């Protein structure tokens, strides 16, 4: 499958054919490898050895495996290491890791020498199905997440589902938030498949894992191709649940609450917000909530990071979200499972507060 300027490959083992795949995109064999500490430990030696066997010249950069690595100071340090290693425009950058590495590496590639090619090698479910696809790369600012960045399409997105077998269950459930999102916003049949084969997917059983990853990547790429720079509102539908999620993440200080966990909570809020004005039927609301009830969170997380929050403070935190215009929040809502739309009219603060209340009540009664 292809997006405007990238190619997505789902294959195991994908790294052993990276030289051949680079050639299809006209990429040279001088590559900066960006890892986080975890991916360097788990996969670094195998990736480097495989690439060197295929004739690559590589240098490696390693950052801490945390959201705070997406910062100006970290980027500045990496620029310096690349300059000292004589990296010029003939090089490319491969991001091996999750969303933090992909965002940070994409940001650096977009800005270094006014732009060098970037390749994404995602190693988490969330990155494989969402953040590595579509070319939106950014770092954080103390006043908000992903506020400073670029559109910089990866030349290649190399997806190997086998990498997921090293992940703890918390990371799998976090990634499933984005997988489920695609069923909600674009594909009722995919939603039904996830409902039927949920246990197999979260246990990483084939062929269901690869089906879920491939379908998610296809939906994301298809939306990006139709609305690369978010001019029609279609690409914004990928942010279902994210307006609430970004507010939650900001209130957590971008620590101790994973992005996927925030998105899952946010989708519950968004389902209630879709239902309250009458857009989403009761039956679809119940089906959606039934699937989201199968998520698992660390003990006490929902209470600490959502149920105990002040609702008004959460709404104010949401106002820093990128999906607002002139302090008017825009929400991605559903009118049925499998179809989303962008809505920025007639949604009052009272509506939002009530949706948060409904979600809090649901989480409490569901025993999270």
Curated annotation (Swiss-Prot):
Q: What is the lineage of its organism?
A: Bacteria, Pseudomonadati, Chlorobiota, Chlorobiia, Chlorobiales
Which pathway features in its UniProt record?
Metabolic intermediate biosynthesis; chorismate biosynthesis; chorismate from D-erythrose 4-phosphate and phosphoenolpyruvate: step 2/7
One Pfam annotation, family name?
A: DHQS_C
State the function annotated in the UniProt record. Answer: Catalyzes the conversion of 3-deoxy-D-arabino-heptulosonate 7-phosphate (DAHP) to dehydroquinate (DHQ).
Q: What terms describe the molecular function in GO for this protein?
A: 3-dehydroquinate synthase activity; metal ion binding; nucleotide binding
By its UniProt entry, which Gene3D superfamilies does this protein fall under?
Answer: 3.40.50.1970, Dehydroquinate synthase-like - alpha domain
Tell me the SUPFAM superfamilies matching this sequence: Dehydroquinate synthase-like
The places in or outside the cell where this protein is found are:
Cytoplasm
> Which cysteines are cross-linked by disulfides?
none
Task: Report residues binding NAD(+).
Answer: 99-103, 123-124, 136, 145
What name does the UniProt record give this protein?
3-dehydroquinate synthase
Q: What are the recorded Gene Ontology BP terms? A: amino acid biosynthetic process; aromatic amino acid family biosynthetic process; chorismate biosynthetic process
Catalytic reactions on record: 7-phospho-2-dehydro-3-deoxy-D-arabino-heptonate = 3-dehydroquinate + phosphate
Give the gene that encodes this protein: aroB
* CDD domains (UniProt xref): DHQS
């Amino acid at each position: 499958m292809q997006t405007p300027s990238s190619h997505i490959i789902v294959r195991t083992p994908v790294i052993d054919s990276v030289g051949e795949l680079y050639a299809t995109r006209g990429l040279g064999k001088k590559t900066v490898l960006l890892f986080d500490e975890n991916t360097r430990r788990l996969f670094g030696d195998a990736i480097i050895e495989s690439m060197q066997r295929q004739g690559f010249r590589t240098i490696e950069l390693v950052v801490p495996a945390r959201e705070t690595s997406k910062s100006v100071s970290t980027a500045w340090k990496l620029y310096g290491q690349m300059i000292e290693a004589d990296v010029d425009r003939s090089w490319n950058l491969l991001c091996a890791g999750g969303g933090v590495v992909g965002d940070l590496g994409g940001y650096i590639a977009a800005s270094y020498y006014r732009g060098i090619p970037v390749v994404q090698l995602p190693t988490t479910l969330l990155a494989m199905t969402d953040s590595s696809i579509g070319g939106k790369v950014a770092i954080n600012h103390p006043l908000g997440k992903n506020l400073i960045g670029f559109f910089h399409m990866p030349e290649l997105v190399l997806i190997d589902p086998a990498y997921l077998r090293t992940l703890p269950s918390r990371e799998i459930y976090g990634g499933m938030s984005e997988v489920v999102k695609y069923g909600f916003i674009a594909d009722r049949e995919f939603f039904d498949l996830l409902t039927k084969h949920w246990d197999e997917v979260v246990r990483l059983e084939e062929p269901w894992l690869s089906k879920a990853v491939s379908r998610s990547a296809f939906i994301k790429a298809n939306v990006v191709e139709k609305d690369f720079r978010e001019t029609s509102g279609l690409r914004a539908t990928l942010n279902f649940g994210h307006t609430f999620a970004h507010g939650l993440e900001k209130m957590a200080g971008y620590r101790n609450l994973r992005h996927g966990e925030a998105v899952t909570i946010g989708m519950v809020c968004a389902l209630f917000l879709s239902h309250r004005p009458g857009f989403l039927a009761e039956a679809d609301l119940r089906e959606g909530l039934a699937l989201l009830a199968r998520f698992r969170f660390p003990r006490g997380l929902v209470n600490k990071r959502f149920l105990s929050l002040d609702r008004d403070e959460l709404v104010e935190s949401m106002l820093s979200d990128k999906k607002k215009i002139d302090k008017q929040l825009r929400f991605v809502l559903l009118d049925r499972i499998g179809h989303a739309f962008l809505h920025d009219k007639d949604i009052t603060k009272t509506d939002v507060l009530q949706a948060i209340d409904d979600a809090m009540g649901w989480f409490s009664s569901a025993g999270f």
